[in-house]
């Protein structure tokens, strides 16, 4: 198993290029099930979650070729309608194949993601939506089975904003009979990217990026060529890496408008951000100011940037309150940050971070994807050496992050434990 060794205290400088979006690529790949044809996607990141999605689709019968960051998917040979537990258990997003398989074959059987309590997770919103469109859904032995000769358009109002649910039902509705209206839909840029792909295939979709999406079902969809949008969470992570080290970094291939809430808070903290000629320059101050954040659905502050922002606030002047309003149990990085000498207390969904003068490198353990990133950031800004174990989480969502940081002057290397 690999670990990262970081010798902190170096100001980052230079240029870095953001990879394609993981969270956009996963549903886009799944959407090709709807269109028996050859498809081509560029700017695809090389990540573990991408490989898992590819394995799921190959298990269904798709032929997939990769060449660098270009992936070609031939879905004409898909002849199975079941996604088994051995693959789905490793990634919750795999459940998105249910709707497209149901649309194509009239039947689909997909394992529930590992540790997924139906009532507590938004997957119940996916199933309620498919049922509203006429699907007969049964749960047994850890599998969801759905049947429908023809999905029919419906008006669906989500109880809470759900990115996966919005993506799932938008795909299912693309070839349903009649009009589907999704109300209280999620507004994330990744949903807009998926809608653009479906529209290129021939779907009729209006309103993606707003809270009301209208889909007028068509009989069939065709092949598509598409360049994946940049990963806004990776971009945000590099912005904080520049800020926390007092560095000066230029970031290429990012869309700053997708990170308005983060940009506002970073500027509030004293970070200088300059957007010129599609290159974003981030200059960190000698000492950041404390800033309160509350995670919200897009366009609010992204929950996927909460852990990284907390790492920054560990060195701020003053105290900040960080409220997590999207997910439960998303403070698992707190105990590890405290090993660096951070002063953090939690109560319910709020963490109070009192800035300290310095952090000291420590052996720490990654608990999830974004928590892993927060530990790297803390390590970059720490005295001494930091060792981060269980970094396989990182490989789910960051493409070659240690190489990119090393290119900015960080003393960081991946070694085998």
From Swiss-Prot:
List-wise, which residues carry 2-(S-cysteinyl)pyruvic acid O-phosphothioketal?
116
Q: Could you identify this protein by its name?
A: UDP-N-acetylglucosamine 1-carboxyvinyltransferase
UniProt source species:
Geotalea daltonii (strain DSM 22248 / JCM 15807 / FRC-32) (Geobacter daltonii)
The record's PANTHER family line, in alphabetical order, gives: UDP-N-ACETYLGLUCOSAMINE 1-CARBOXYVINYLTRANSFERASE (PTHR43783:SF1)
Q: Which family does it belong to?
A: Belongs to the EPSP synthase family. MurA subfamily.
Where do the TM regions start and end? none
Q: Which UniProt keywords apply?
A: Cell cycle, Cell division, Cell shape, Cell wall biogenesis/degradation, Cytoplasm, Peptidoglycan synthesis, Pyruvate, Transferase
* Predominant place of localization: cytoplasm
Described by its record, this protein's role is as follows: Cell wall formation. Adds enolpyruvyl to UDP-N-acetylglucosamine.
Q: Which NCBIfam families does the record match to this protein?
A: murA, PRK09369.1
